[in-house]
């Protein structure tokens, strides 16, 4: 989860988020090197007294500054496309959960079970227990098995919402009349927090998401108790 004054991303909990972090570091280094080079050239231009007024054209220089940016863009685009296709790939999910956004709460339906569905509301600050997080706790957590591919079907009953869990690398729009899908796989157990990430009205900040990733045996016991 996030911490106060955190400057980086949350710890990756899924293979997709790990790939996103690697791509971020790769792209950030390229941007840093380009910015440093530009600042160095600007500082030289401002401080040097040397001039060159006899140059009418420079084919070699023009060739270099055309080819070099193209190579840099390719070095950014190829890993970006790889991560993009990984995020859209869904192979034989073990479980499917349908998520519906409402003003201002989420409802969940486990489609592999006949009557396993519930609404998830934020717990008001006045009802929080010691150690619970303000504006992030819910009355019904989404319990899911870890280390298994899970398909999330995401839509909305009213306005545009967005279902996002940063530590899993997930952010999918919930659009009325349209069913979007995303895949998540958690590599370790724990509680993972998210929030609606699309402004959806006056209580937009009060519809958090809490995923509880547990071993498969614990999930089976939980699902049996809910039916």
UniProtKB/Swiss-Prot annotation:
Membrane topology value: Multi-pass membrane protein
EC identifiers of the protein: 7.1.1.9
Residues that bind Mg(2+): 198
Cofactor detail note: Binds a dinuclear copper A center per subunit.
Name assigned to this protein: Cytochrome c oxidase subunit 2
Binding-site residues for Cu cation A1, renumbered to this chain: 161, 196, 200, 207
GO cellular component entries: mitochondrial inner membrane; respiratory chain complex IV
Catalysed conversion reaction: 4 Fe(II)-[cytochrome c] + O2 + 8 H(+)(in) = 4 Fe(III)-[cytochrome c] + 2 H2O + 4 H(+)(out)
A single GO molecular function term of this UniProt record: copper ion binding
């Amino acid at each position: 989860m996030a911490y106060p004054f955190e400057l980086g991303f949350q710890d990756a909990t899924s293979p997709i988020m790990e790939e996103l972090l690697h791509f971020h570091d790769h792209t950030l280094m390229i941007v840093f090197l380009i910015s440093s080079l530009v600042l160095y050239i600007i500082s030289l231009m401002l401080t040097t007294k040397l001039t060159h007024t006899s140059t009418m054209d420079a084919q070699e220089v023009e060739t270099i500054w055309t080819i070099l940016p193209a190579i840099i863009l390719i070095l950014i685009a190829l890993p970006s496309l790889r991560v993009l296709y990984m995020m859209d790939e869904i192979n034989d999910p073990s479980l499917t959960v349908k998520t519906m956004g409402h003003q201002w709460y989420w409802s969940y339906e486990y489609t592999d079970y006949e009557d396993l569905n519930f609404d998830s509301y934020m717990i008001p600050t006045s009802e929080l227990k010691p150690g619970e997080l303000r504006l992030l706790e819910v009355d019904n957590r989404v319990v899911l098995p870890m280390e298994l591919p899970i398909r999330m079907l995401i839509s909305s009953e009213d306005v545009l919402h967005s279902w996002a869990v940063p530590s899993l690398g997930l952010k999918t729009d919930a659009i009325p009349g349209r069913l979007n899908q995303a895949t998540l796989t958690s590599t370790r157990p724990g509680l993972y927090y998210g929030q609606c990430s699309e402004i959806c009205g006056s209580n937009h900040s009060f519809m958090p998401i809490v995923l509880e990733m547990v071993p498969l045996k614990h999930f089976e016991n939980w699902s049996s108790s809910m039916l």
